[in-house]
Curated annotation (Swiss-Prot):
Cellular location(s): Nucleus; Nucleus, Nucleoplasm; Nucleus, Nucleolus; Cytoplasm
Protein's organism: Bos taurus (Bovine)
NTD region: annotated span: 1147-1276
PANTHER family reported in the protein's UniProt record: ATP-DEPENDENT RNA HELICASE, ATP-DEPENDENT RNA HELICASE A
Binding-site residues, Mn(2+): 415, 509
Family: Belongs to the DEAD box helicase family. DEAH subfamily.
Record protein name field: ATP-dependent RNA helicase A
Region called HA2, residue ranges: 828-916
Motif (Nuclear localization signal (NLS1)): 583-592
């Protein structure tokens, strides 16, 4: 194989060029591979190869590049050394050959040149379609913006009016001054600007969306803004702000030059920080050791000084990439597996020719068609699908055009059949080795269920000619002549290796317009211009596809007619009339203050009812609140359906998991629907696959299946036995407002397109019925389409993907989107990534940015996880990060959590610690098998599905970090205690403060808190910190960090964790100033702390950031840090202790005294405590050998014999980590250290190990959390026998 490398060198040498090879190791130490990329100047292609050794990886990369040169006619195939793989001859045709004869062969990867390719001369060998940009650059003229960018250096922090975290980026235009400037602009340009308002959410949680599009004649294009606010005024202000900021970045208007008159929020009293002398000395010493210069005390207190140090270490700026990149594509090749993105270096396929592969696969298929009776029966079923009549037309269009759109009604069979038409056509025409098809689906359940269906139709199990790949689960098909179904997100992650070895990309459900699909369409549009031989098939429901057709150069559209059976649809007034429904009397229960509705000035369409309906119907309809989902009416419809005596499943569309769960419980409580005659199944993306699968299973005769689903069942998945659809006409969307970092989950009206899709789900087996729970008048007012997700979500993650795939500038790339996002959102994303050190001075990915781009999590959490690895608490940080992707695991009857859930927080006053404790306890419980896991979740009222999904996500995050080179030791699972001192947990909370910044708040009284700049908010009712009643609460520290701000009628903070002021100074602040007496954090928190101490802590943050820079360049150094960095980490551990700031967490243990005593725990096996012997929550009660006798330090205390610090956490060796390894009794309990090799260590060999065999150890006698007798945590689960307490 080495010959091909020399061949490429020689070929380049003749042209005075040198191929440039870049090799990197991928995978972890145990199964390391080498990835090689080769580039040649002047060619917009990257050759790629990989192997278990560097030499073969280089040869494979050279081979890939040489095959590319053959495809573009720079080389003849017979000139290439023939070892290994010869490029497939049919696909090696000249890409510029326009002869009709070549194009006439179905599926030939040449074909006549489409008109758009005449534009390619401008694109410099197809670099991403800049020639076509004017048509689609609908957003902003980014060239002007980027050319002036250097002059307008951004100001990171600013003092602005309403909470505005980033006005300095946008010419200091804020909520307060933008609307007036927009009006001036309208007057000057004689524009009639009108806001279009939409109301979202129910009355008690109502908010508004304002949107506007304006034409800017100076630059000859339109700009668009769509923003959200809790009332019309705020929504309009936010919309005006987005428009003005875009005008500023386009150079149409000036920056704001007036003073931003600070609208004073509530002031926070100065907080006295009690710092010990010892810690101050320690801080000064470490700062000296690190050679950090701290800012001296200001001479004049009226002129405060900034304490923040600049960056101490920066990533070397990498070379700027070509202005426009394109994802590399190559046709299928014999020794390349496209599904694993790796070369096949071993086995028969490594040396098989394309002709051999094609012949073998054709023979296999022909034999199967002749011999398999079941397959013949399935083929007859397939013949009946409407799409079958269009097979030859579809194949002809795909053969002749790089892009084809197929539009077909729900259930016509396009999703399952089109990929099979292409595959079978290739196999039967001896071109099997040239065919690999990837099909994207918007959701995991659709990818898996469609793959399983296609495998069944082919008489196979998944993994042969058909497979799937979704997050957490893959069954990959064979490397040639196969179909892979995957989610769009999975395909985007695969693009890093290019679209290599794939002949056809099919994008299903393009009308959904999620951010990933829109992103993929931009990538594919560029790919198809650079590589016209690739085939792109876009599939959509029966909606207007003209926008997609125009976007893809007026490509052909094939219309597939024929839904199986007609569906009769009814609206709210019809439903009320046919069921004689009378709404129950309204609940007079007083609403909580923050849930109060206000004046509703949006028309109530339930008051509009045609004359053809009776008076009773009109009265009943007027009594129903449009914004709420009427459960009683759904019940009435279910009873009505029963009277029709037409068997079939009922599919009920509801917005969001909460309503599905509540509706399921509501129906199950009803003796009629809770009986064996009904099977009620939830369907939601967050429930496990095995639960999701149940909806496809047939039910016995006489049983009615009721499926309660979100819009997941709207597209792709087809549940064959559905005859009835009850449609709430709503859906839940996440709205994000960048200028104040506010998230809002709003229930909004679905679009007409959504309703059409939902209706189509009925009528698969017989004529169907669809009941829309909105009035005809409301239906007329619905939007035709939903707003694209790209307009209502932060763009940080997509921006990282653009850089990872080398697609050029973030803004320039997004300007090519089918509907580009507003320019101000793009600039926000770039700024955030620069601040995180993910982008360097040339706006290219840094080593840190490269890792963040690979983590499927918010970039800030990604950096927090890397810091967690440095402190050896990576596992806990991964758990918390994973948990943020899913709903809380608590099943709560009311809005507030009960004691059974609050107790998981121990005395840490933290929702995040509660999540960590729940996860830890569940992980322990499931060691006893599935039954123990189920019992534990039922007893603790926890959602087992959520916990399992969190585990999957955590494992995935850890694997990515390990594959990036982080040592496995820094990601080992640890046990935390939430009721006593635990320095590792202190560090986790410090890092969490970094991860959720700028979400910091200060507790005032009861539920009231102040957020950034002293704005009022409330503690969210689902928090462990939410008081039970109006009684006031005192917390050990008034400072909290929180996960997100949720806008209901008031603003509330969700996911709260108590922190100390030192943790804020260290990790949750951007601007720290001192006047010598007081320290001001982010312009609103005032701390009484010595200037020197504050300056030292702030300097440590800079030193920590510098360490992150070094670690991300070479993650392996974590296990061998130099002594100075070790001491710095130890100092940060000290600062993270609550006691370092004079805070005693023990004070608050009776904070829940305004309610009943916590219930006693039920027995599990022996004993009765939740954790080991005794009768209460903490083994022997809070008094007996728990907290009391022996206490933290003495015998029989908290940590087992010898107590928490007898023999000690630090005992034995000289540094922090020394205690893990040795010393008389560390965390591991009696004798032996955390990982001591004798007597009861964490993984001790003799006196009881991790799962102690012979008494003791982590869960054995005298183990981590218990003094005396046998049975530690599991008391017998893993110790000897099942004695002495435990579950």
């Amino acid at each position: 194989m080495g010959d091909v490398k020399n061949f490429l060198y020689a070929w380049c040498g003749k042209r005075k060029m040198t191929p440039s090879y870049e090799i990197r190791a991928v995978g972890n130490k145990n199964r390391q591979k080498f990835m090689c990329e080769v580039r040649v100047e002047g060619y917009n292609y990257t050759g790629m190869g990989n192997s278990t050794n560097k030499k073969d990886a280089q040869s494979n990369a050279a081979r890939d590049f040489v095959n590319y040169l053959v495809r573009i006619n720079e080389l003849k195939s017979e000139e290439v050394p023939a070892v290994g793989v010869a490029p497939p001859t049919p696909s090696a045709t000249d890409s510029s050959d326009t002869t009709a004869e070549d194009g006439g062969v179905p599926g030939n990867l040449g074909g006549p040149l489409p008109p758009h390719l005449t534009l390619q001369a401008e694109n410099n060998s197809g670099g991403g379609g800049s020639g076509y940009v004017p048509t689609w650059d609908r957003g902003a003229n980014l060239k002007d913006y980027y050319s002036r960018k250097e002059e307008q250096e951004v100001q990171a922090t600013l003092e602005s009016e309403e909470v505005d975290l980033n006005a300095g980026l946008h010419g200091n235009w804020t909520l307060e001054n933008a609307k007036a400037r927009l009006n001036q602009y309208f007057q000057k340009e004689k524009i009639q600007g009108e806001y279009k308002y939409t109301q979202v959410g129910p009355d008690h949680n109502r908010s508004f969306i304002a949107e506007m599009t304006i034409y800017i004649k100076q630059i000859g294009r339109r700009i668009f803004a769509r923003e959200h606010g809790s009332n019309k005024k705020l929504a309009a202000q936010s919309c005006a702000l987005s428009l003005v900021r875009q005008l500023y970045h386009l150079g149409v208007i000036e920056p704001y030059s007036g003073l931003t008159k600070k609208k004073e929020g509530e002031t926070v009293e100065p907080y006295k920080v009690n710092l010990s002398q010892d810690l101050e000395h320690q801080l000064q010493n470490i700062v000296q050791e690190l050679n950090l210069e701290i800012v001296p005390i200001p001479e004049d207190p009226s002129v405060p000084v900034a304490l923040n140090l600049g960056k101490l270490a920066q990533f070397e700026p990498s070379q700027r990439q070509n202005p426009v990149g394109v994802v590399p594509w190559s046709p299928p090749q014999s020794n390349w597996n496209p599904w694993t993105s790796s070369n096949i270096d071993e086995g028969p396929l490594a040396y098989a020719t394309p002709e051999q592969i094609s012949m073998d696969l054709k023979n296999e298929l022909m034999y199967q068609l002749e011999q398999d009776r079941d397959l013949q029966a399935v083929l007859q079923e397939r013949e009946l699908l409407p799409v079958k009549k269009f097979e030859s037309e579809i194949l002809e269009a795909i053969s002749q055009n790089p892009v084809v759109i197929i539009r077909g009604a729900t259930g016509c069979g396009k999703t399952t059949q089109v990929p099979q038409f292409i595959l079978d056509d290739c196999i039967q025409n001896d071109r099997a080795a040239e065919c690999n098809i990837v099909v994207t689906q918007p959701r995991r359940i659709s990818a898996v269920s469609v793959a399983e269906r296609v495998a069944y139709e082919r008489g196979e199990e998944p993994g042969k000619s058909c497979g799937y790949s979704v997050r957490f689960e893959s069954i990959l098909p064979r490397p040639h002549a196969s179909i892979m179904f995957c989610t769009v997100g999975v395909l985007l992650r695969k693009l890093e290796a290019g679209i290599r070895g794939i002949s056809h990309v099919i994008v299903d459900e393009i009308h959904e317009r999620d951010i990933n699909t829109d992103f993929l369409l931009v990538v594919l549009r560029d790919v198809v211009q650079a590589y016209p031989e690739v085939r792109i098939v876009l599939m959509s429901a029966t909606i207007d596809t003209s926008m997609f057709c125009e976007y893809f150069f007026n490509c052909p559209i094939i219309e597939v007619y024929g839904r199986t059976f007609p569906v009769q649809e009814y609206f709210l007034e019809d439903c009320i009339q046919m069921t004689h429904f009378v709404p129950p009397p309204k609940d007079k229960k007083k609403k909580d203050k923050d849930d109060d509705g206000g004046e509703d000035d949006d028309a109530n369409c339930n008051l509009i009812c045609g004359d053809e309906y009776g008076a009773e119907t009109r009265i009943s309809m007027a009594q129903l609140n449009e914004k709420e989902t009427p459960f009683e009416l759904i019940e009435a419809l279910l009873l009505y359906i029963e009277t029709l005596n037409v068997p079939g499943a009922v599919l009920v569309f509801l917005p969001g998991w909460n309503l599905i769960y509540t509706m399921q419980k509501h129906l199950e409580m009803n003796p009629h629907f809770g009986s064996h005659r009904y099977q009620i199944l939830p369907l939601h993306s967050q429930i496990p696959r095995e639960e999701q699968r149940k909806v496809f299973d047939p039910v016995p005769s006489g049983v009615t299946k009721i499926i309660l689903s979100t819009n997941i069942a709207e597209t792709s998945i087809t549940i064959n036995d559905v005859v009835y659809v009850i449609d709430s006409c709503k859906q839940k969307v996440k709205l994000f407002t960048a200028h104040n970092n506010m998230t809002n989950y709003a229930t909004v009206w679905a679009s007409k397109t959504n309703l059409e899709q939902r209706k189509g789900r009925a009528g698969r087996v017989r004529p169907g019925f669809c009941f829309h729970l909105c009035s005809r008048a409301r239906f007329e007012r619905l939007e035709t389409h939903m707003t694209p997700e790209m307009f209502r979500t932060p763009l940080h993650e997509i921006a990282l993907s653009i850089k990872l795939l080398r697609l050029g500038g973030i803004g320039q790339f997004l300007a090519k989107a089918i509907e580009p996002p507003p320019l101000d959102a793009v600039i926000e994303a770039e700024h955030t990534l620069r601040e995180l050190d993910a982008l360097d001075a040339n706006d290219e990915l840094t080593p840190l940015g490269r890792i963040l781009a690979k983590l499927p999590i918010e970039p800030r959490f990604g950096k927090m996880m890397i810091m967690g690895c440095i402190f050896y608490v990576g596992d806990a940080i991964c758990t918390i990060s994973a948990a943020t992707c899913f709903p809380e695991p608590f099943i709560s009857e009311g809005k507030r959590l009960g004691y059974i859930h609050r107790n998981f927080a121990g005395n840490r006053f933290s929702d995040h610690v509660a999540l960590l404790s729940v996860f830890q306890a569940w992980d322990d419980a499931r060691m006893g098998g599935e039954e123990a896991e189920i019992r534990f979740c039922e007893h603790k009222r926890l959602n087992m599905a959520t916990l399992r999904m969190t585990w999957e996500a955590k494992v995935q995050l850890k694997e990515i970090l390990i594959n990036s080179g982080f040592p496995e030791e820094c990601l080992l699972t640890q046990v935390f205690t939430n009721t006593g001192p635990d320095n590792n947990l202190d560090v986790v909370i410090s890092l969490l403060a970094f991860g959720v910044y700028p979400n910091v708040c200060y507790h005032k009284e009861k539920r009231k808190i102040l957020t950034t700049e002293g704005r009022n908010a409330l503690i969210h009712k689902s928090s462990v910190n939410c008081p039970f009643s109006s009684q006031d609460m005192k917390y050990p520290s008034p400072f909290f960090v929180f996960g997100e701000k949720i806008r209901t009628r008031a603003i509330s903070a969700k996911g709260m964790t108590l922190v100390t002021p030192l943790q804020l100074l260290l990790f949750a602040s951007k601007k720290v100033q001192s006047d010598g007496q007081l320290v001001l954090v982010d312009d609103w928190i005032r701390l009484q702390i010595s200037h020197e101490a504050a300056a030292c802590i702030t300097a440590l943050r800079a030193a920590m950031e510098a360490l992150v820079v070094e670690v991300t360049k070479q993650p392996g150094i974590i296990s061998q840090l130099d002594p100075v960095n070790e001491r710095m980490l130890n100092t940060i551990r000290q600062i993270s202790r609550p006691s370092a700031a004079g805070i005693n967490l023990m004070i608050g243990t009776t904070r829940y005294g305004d309610g009943p005593r916590p219930p006693k725990m039920a027995r599990y096996d022996n004993g009765s405590g939740y954790r080991r012997g005794g009768s209460s929550y903490s083994g022997g009660g809070y008094g007996l050998g728990g907290y009391g006798t022996g206490g933290y330090g003495g015998g029989g205390g908290y940590g087992g014999r010898g107590g928490y610090s007898g023999g000690g956490y630090g005992g034995g060796s000289n540094s922090f980590r020394g205690s893990y390894v040795g010393g008389g009794g560390g965390v591991g309990g009696g004798g032996g250290g955390f990982r001591g090799l004798s007597r009861g260590g964490y993984r001790g060999m003799s006196g009881g190990d991790y799962r102690g065999e012979s008494g003791g150890g982590y869960r054995g006698s005298g183990g981590f959390q218990r003094g005396g007798g046998r049975g530690g945590y599991g008391g017998g689960y893993f110790g000897q026998g099942r004695g002495g307490g435990g579950y």
